[in-house]
């Protein structure tokens, strides 16, 4: 079976580099699945989980806060604003960020711009969902 090379990088560091049978990523318009020989594509990512299935069928999970994904027939590059291995996420910090964002939205004043707070809430929720999916898969 053919594979594709996957690189997941953020501004801070390279998170993953290796061969894969498949990758699933949170594209702006919905999740996308990429397999070898996929048509070229360049699209934005929303906060969420990136799942990489390696040559042996083992899955690895990552969190991205957004960014872009570039797809070529045998190579995928995820350029994330922020990226982390799912197992390295801090659940307590994500819960606290969610609480603060919800509180700020509940106490907002008319005319103030809260788009940054909404973005922070979306990122915290995506981190928590990634952790929850990782826990569910670990129970299998």
UniProtKB/Swiss-Prot annotation:
Pfam families: ATP-synt_DE, ATP-synt_DE_N. GO terms for molecular function: ATP binding; proton-transporting ATP synthase activity, rotational mechanism. It is a peripheral membrane protein. The keyword Ion transport applies. Keywords: ATP synthesis, Cell inner membrane, Cell membrane, CF(1), Hydrogen ion transport, Ion transport, Membrane, Transport. The keyword Cell inner membrane applies. GO terms for cellular component: plasma membrane; proton-transporting ATP synthase complex. It comes from the Bacteria. It is found in: Cell inner membrane. Produces ATP from ADP in the presence of a proton gradient across the membrane. Belongs to the ATPase epsilon chain family. F-type ATPases have 2 components, CF(1) - the catalytic core - and CF(0) - the membrane proton channel. CF(1) has five subunits: alpha(3), beta(3), gamma(1), delta(1), epsilon(1). CF(0) has three main subunits: a, b and c. This is ATP synthase epsilon chain. It comes from Alkalilimnicola ehrlichii (strain ATCC BAA-1101 / DSM 17681 / MLHE-1).
């Amino acid at each position: 079976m053919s594979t594709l090379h996957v690189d997941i990088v953020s501004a801070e560091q390279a998170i993953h580099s290796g061969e894969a049978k498949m990758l699933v990523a949170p594209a702006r318009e919905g999740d996308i699945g990429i397999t070898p020989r996929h048509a070229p594509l360049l699209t934005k990512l929303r906060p969420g989980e990136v799942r990489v299935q390696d040559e042996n069928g083992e899955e690895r999970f990552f969190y991205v806060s957004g960014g872009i994904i570039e797809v070529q027939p045998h190579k995928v590059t995820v350029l994330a604003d922020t990226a982390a291995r799912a197992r390295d996420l801090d659940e307590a910090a994500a819960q606290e960020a969610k609480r603060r964002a919800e509180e700020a939205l509940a106490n907002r004043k008319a005319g103030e711009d809260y788009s940054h707070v909404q973005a922070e809430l979306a990122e915290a929720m995506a981190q928590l969902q990634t952790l929850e999916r990782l826990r569910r898969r670990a129970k299998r």
